[in-house]
Amino acid sequence: MGILNSISTPADLKALAEEDLEVLAGEIRSFLVDKVAATGGHLGPNLGVVELTIGLHRVFDSPREPIIFDTSHQSYVHKILTGRGDAFDTLRQKGGLSGYTSRAESEHDWTESSHASAALSYADGMSKAFQLDGDTNRNVVAVVGDGALTGGMCWEALNNIAAGKDRNVVVVVNDNGRSYSPTIGGFAENLAQLRMEPFYDRVMEQGKSTLKSMGWVGERTFEALHAFKEGVKSTVIPTEMFPELGMKYIGPVNGHDQKAVDNALAYARDFKGPIIVHVVTEKGRGYAPAERDLDELMHATGVMDPRTGIPVAASKPGWTAAFSEELVKLGGRREDIVAITAAMAGPTGLAKFAANFPSRFYDVGIAEQHALTSAAGLALAGKHPVVAIYSTFLNRAFDQLLMDVALLNLPVTVVLDRSGVTGSDGASHNGVWDLALTSIVPGIRVAAPRDEDTLRELLGEAVDINDGPSVVRFPKGDLPAPIEAIETLEDGVDILAYLEASPASEDAPDLLIVAVGERATLALELGERLVAAGANVTVVDPRWVIPIPQSLVALAADHDLVITIEDGVIHGGVGSLLSDALNAAEVDTPRRQVAVPQKFLDHASRGQVLLDHDLDIDSVEKTALGWMDRLFGGGN
C-alpha cells in the first residue's frame, strides 16, 4: 500500500504523477476488499468507482466545491482519499465510520441521507445559494448512479438544473447498469444505447478511412453517406436524451481509463453552466468473486473471506426467505396476485416470485411513489398487488399510500422488510417510522408477525382483504424460535401466556404486556421476570396491530397496568393508538410504552442500538420494575 499510505488529503492526490494513478487504484481495490471483508458493507459499488473518485478529487477543489454522492453507499473511496482510511476497521460499527457520507465525519461530506435520487436536488439548491452569494467560479458536483436515475426526483431536479444556464452544476452519471441488480426501465435502456456510441464511432471512422482511400468515387460515396449519418445514428444511439433537457452532455467515458476520466471532468469543471458527464463503470471491478456474482456483483456483503468472497457465518433461515416462499405459494393458488419491487427483487424476497411468475412481476426501478400508485392501478383493474419494499422507503411513498390507495379503498398489500431497528446501516435505514405513519391512514390494516408461522398466516390474511390496503411488517435478520398461542380471541388476538405471581398473592398486580411483532420473545421473558417480582402477567400478541382490536381494550380494563412493547418510534405507534382507544372507552388503566425514542439512531449493530436506548431485556425489566414500584409499591 505504498502510494495509498501517502494519501491523506485531496492535495496529496493532486501531487501524484499520472503513472502512479493506476498503481494507486489497484491499492485502493485491495484495501477495500480487505477492510469490507472484515466488517461487511457495500463492496461492489465502491470497486466500480475507484478511478472516478480519484478523478473527482484530482480535478475539483473539495470541500470548497462540494462533491455529493447520491445514496452515498459508493463513497468509501471518497472517505479513503479524504483522510479516513485509518478508521476503516470501524466501518459501520458503534462510534466508527458510517457506511454513507456523514457530516459529522468530515468537511468533505456535505450530506448524509442514504435514500436514492436526492443528490441532484441538493446540488440544485446549493448552486442557487452560491449564485446568490456571487460565487460564480464554484462548481457543485453530483454523482448519481447505481440505478438512482430511475427515481422521479432526479428528473424533477434535472428540469430545474437545466433552467439555470449560468449555474455550475456537474452531474456525473455513474453508469454501471445496476442498482442492487440490473437496472430496469426505459432510462436504463437509453443508457445502454449510449454505451454503444464508442463502438458506433469506431465503425464509422473505419468506413470513412476505407472510402477515402478509394479516391474520387470513395470521397463522393462518403459525402452521400454522411448526409444521412446523423439520422441513422439517432435511431441507434439516443444522444439527444440529455441535450433535449437543455444541458451539455459529454460521454460515454470509460470510467476505468484514468486519463479519460480526468480529461472529461476537467472539461466539465471549466464549462460554464450545467453539464452531464456520462461515465461507464463496472460494478465489482477487479475482484473476481464480485465479478462472478452476476445477480448483485457483491452490492453489499457481510463479513467474508477476502480470498473467496464466501461469508464467514452460514446464513440461517430469515424473515425475507420465509416471506418469499409463502408469496410463491399464494401466487400459485391465485392468478390475481402480482408483485412489485422498487429495484430490489433480491433483497426484498421477490426474485423467486419473478422466476415463477415473470408476467406477474414488475420492477419499477427506484421509484417507490410510482410503485404504490401503479399498484393502485392494478388493483382498480382487478388484481391484488403485493408491493415489497424496505420499511424506511415507505416514507417516500406515504402520499401515494394515503391518497392513491387508501382513499380509494383499494386492496393493495404492502410488505415492509427491515422494519424496526436495523442497526449498522444507520439513521436513514432504520424502519422505525412505519407504525406511526400507517397509524393515521384511514381504513388501513397493519400486521406484525412474531415468527415464521404468523408471518405466513398474516400474509395469507392480508391478500384476502379486498376492501382496503393492508401492511405486513417484519424485521431484518434471522427468524426467532416459534411461539405458540395458548388461546386466540374472537378478533384474532393471540394470548401467549398467563403467568401467576410466585409466590401467589391476592395483592399481586395484574399486568398486561402487549407485544408487537418480533418483540414477543422479549415480552415473554419480561413476563417471567415480572412474575418473579410479584406480578400476575398476561402476554398478548395482537397480530393485527392497526387498528387496535377491541379485545385489547377489554383486556386492558381488567388489568392494573398495560405495557406495550414495540420496535417503532414512541409517538404515534401501537402504544399511542392503544392509549387513545382506552381514553375513548373511558378505561383508566395506567399504560406505559417501551418503544424507540423519537430521534435519529446512530449506526451500530442492532443489539448495540437496542442496548444504547434501553430496549434490551435487562433495561426493559429495570424500567418495568420502576413503573411497578411507583404504581403499586411492590417492585423489587
Swiss-Prot record:
Catalytic activity: D-glyceraldehyde 3-phosphate + pyruvate + H(+) = 1-deoxy-D-xylulose 5-phosphate + CO2
GO molecular function: 1-deoxy-D-xylulose-5-phosphate synthase activity; magnesium ion binding; thiamine pyrophosphate binding
Sorted UniProt keywords: Isoprene biosynthesis, Magnesium, Metal-binding, Thiamine biosynthesis, Thiamine pyrophosphate, Transferase
Pathway: Metabolic intermediate biosynthesis; 1-deoxy-D-xylulose 5-phosphate biosynthesis; 1-deoxy-D-xylulose 5-phosphate from D-glyceraldehyde 3-phosphate and pyruvate: step 1/1
Protein EC: 2.2.1.7
Annotated GO biological process: 1-deoxy-D-xylulose 5-phosphate biosynthetic process; isopentenyl diphosphate biosynthetic process, methylerythritol 4-phosphate pathway; terpenoid biosynthetic process; thiamine biosynthetic process
Keyword check for Translocase: no
Cofactors demanded by this protein: Mg(2+); thiamine diphosphate
Cofactor annotation remark: Binds 1 Mg(2+) ion per subunit.
A cellular component annotation (GO) from this entry: cytosol
Enzyme class: transferase
CDD domains: TPP_DXS, TPP_PYR_DXS_TK_like
Residues binding Mg(2+): 146, 176
SUPFAM superfamilies: Thiamin diphosphate-binding fold (THDP-binding), TK C-terminal domain-like
Chain sites annotated for binding thiamine diphosphate: 73, 114-116, 147-148, 176, 287, 368
SMART domains to which the protein is assigned, alphabetical: Transket_pyr
Family membership noted in the UniProt record: Belongs to the transketolase family. DXPS subfamily.
Role description: Catalyzes the acyloin condensation reaction between C atoms 2 and 3 of pyruvate and glyceraldehyde 3-phosphate to yield 1-deoxy-D-xylulose-5-phosphate (DXP).
Oligomer and partners: Homodimer.
Protein name: 1-deoxy-D-xylulose-5-phosphate synthase
Annotated source species: Corynebacterium efficiens (strain DSM 44549 / YS-314 / AJ 12310 / JCM 11189 / NBRC 100395)
Gene designation: dxs
